[in-house]
Curated annotation (Swiss-Prot):
Its EC number is 2.7.4.22. This is Uridylate kinase. UMP binds at residues 55, 76, 137-144. It is an enzyme of class 2 (transferase). One of its GO terms (molecular function) is ATP binding. Its main location: cytoplasm. Belongs to the UMP kinase family. The lineage of its organism: Bacteria, Pseudomonadati, Chlamydiota, Chlamydiia, Chlamydiales. The gene is pyrH.
Amino acid sequence: MMKKRVKRVLFKISGEALSDASSSDKISEERLSRLIAELKVVRNADVEVAVVIGGGNILRGLSQSQNLQINRVSADQMGMLATLINGMALADALKTEDVPNLLTSTLSCPQLAELYNPQKASDALSQGKVVICTMGAGAPYLTTDTGAALRACELKVDVLLKATMHVDGVYDRDPREFADAVRYDHISYRDFLSQGLGAIDPSAVSLCMEAGIPIRMFSFTKHSLEEAIFNTVGTVISSTEGGQL
């Protein structure tokens, strides 16, 4: 269990979590409904939640730039737009369930979302709204993980929760390739960076290290958002021995 009361979290989830591999739908009704239910449970537990959502279910910037005749900058910008599409879907679904929320965009899209402002976003969280942050870091060559870490620092969250669909934490090597890969319950920021481990962008880890924000990486196929906040699941990246948040 956690040592301290968690009051504010940044939940980073991939766009892939919204899609169903068995369907051609980019956004699965079942997956979206599950996400809404998870957010409602956590909000009802008096935890303030900001969400950073990826766009990989619609388009991946780097892979698209390699496969199509599109330069990297344009491809990354297209990927950022994909996160806005997912954010709009999430915002509307939350509204349908009477969950107050604020949809924000790092880049100006006034007809679609409010321009992200740290103070306004923090105020919205304090008012019980789910804050949805789209467009990543707002610049090419920077991942959505890095954008999530930036938002986590600005909003002064207690923990950054990164949900994945393929692994249940940080391993010493890729568990999908090596059956004997070992999962860490806890690893320090510096050890994560010095060992060149994957699963989360090192730039994001560096930002969280500077701000002293722990990161919990967990499997969204195995665990709920509530479990990631209140129980010991996945891997904690922090400076605290033992992985306590």
